[in-house]
C-alpha cells in the first residue's frame, strides 16, 4: 500500500512536470524551474523522468519543442526562424541542428517533404475520384463497371 502511494505520488510529480513543460515550452525553461513548480529537487525530478519516461527532463523538453515545431512546419507561410523562436529556441541555428538530429533532415527539407507527400496524396486521391466518376459514368450509360 505504501509503495503504491509512493508510485502514485511519483507519477503525479511527472504528470505535473509534463503539464508545466507543455504550457511553457515556448519560454526559456530550466529543469530547476520545472522542479520548483513540482516542489521536488532537480535530481529527484531527473530520476522520476528516467523511471517514468526513459529520458531526462531536458530530453523531454527538447522532444516536445521539436514535435511542436514539426507541427508548425506544416503551415507553409510560417518562417523557420519564427517557428524556432515560438518553440523556445533563441538561436535558429541551434534549432536547425536539434531538428536535424531528431528528424534526420533540416526543417526546410522536412517542410518540402511534407508538401511533396501532400501533393502525392492529393494526386492519388484525385486519381481515385476520377476513376470513381468514370465507373459511375459507365454505369449510367449502361456499360461495364
Protein language model features and the residues they cover:
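An amphipathic alpha-helical interaction segment
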Residues: 1-5, 9, 44-46
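Residue-level marker of regulatory loop/turn positions in helix-turn-helix DNA-binding domains and
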Residues: 6-10, 23, 38, 61
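Short, structured helix-loop boundary elements
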Residues: 7-14, 31
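Terminal helix-turn-helix DNA-binding modules in bacterial transcription factors
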Residues: 18-19, 23, 28, 32, ...
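Short coil turns linking two alpha-helices in DNA-binding domains
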Residues: 41-42, 90-91
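Short hydrophobic/aromatic patch on the recognition helix
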Residues: 44-45, 49, 94-95, 99
Amino acid at each position: 500500500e505504501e509503495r503504491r502511494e509512493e508510485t502514485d505520488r511519483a507519477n503525479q510529480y511527472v504528470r505535473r512536470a509534463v503539464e508545466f513543460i507543455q504550457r511553457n515550452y515556448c519560454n526559456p525553461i530550466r529543469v530547476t524551474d520545472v522542479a520548483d513548480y513540482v516542489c521536488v529537487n532537480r535530481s529527484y525530478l531527473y530520476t522520476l523522468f528516467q523511471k517514468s519516461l526513459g529520458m531526462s527532463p531536458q530530453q523531454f523538453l527538447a522532444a516536445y519543442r521539436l514535435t511542436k515545431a514539426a507541427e508548425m512546419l506544416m503551415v507553409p507561410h510560417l518562417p523557420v526562424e519564427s517557428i524556432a523562436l515560438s518553440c523556445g529556441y533563441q538561436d535558429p541555428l541551434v534549432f536547425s541542428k536539434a531538428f536535424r538530429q531528431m528528424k534526420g533532415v533540416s526543417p526546410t527539407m522536412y517542410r518540402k517533404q511534407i508538401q511533396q507527400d501532400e501533393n502525392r496524396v492529393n494526386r492519388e486521391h484525385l486519381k481515385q475520384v476520377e476513376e470513381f466518376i468514370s465507373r459511375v459514368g459507365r454505369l449510367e450509360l449502361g456499360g461495364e463497371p
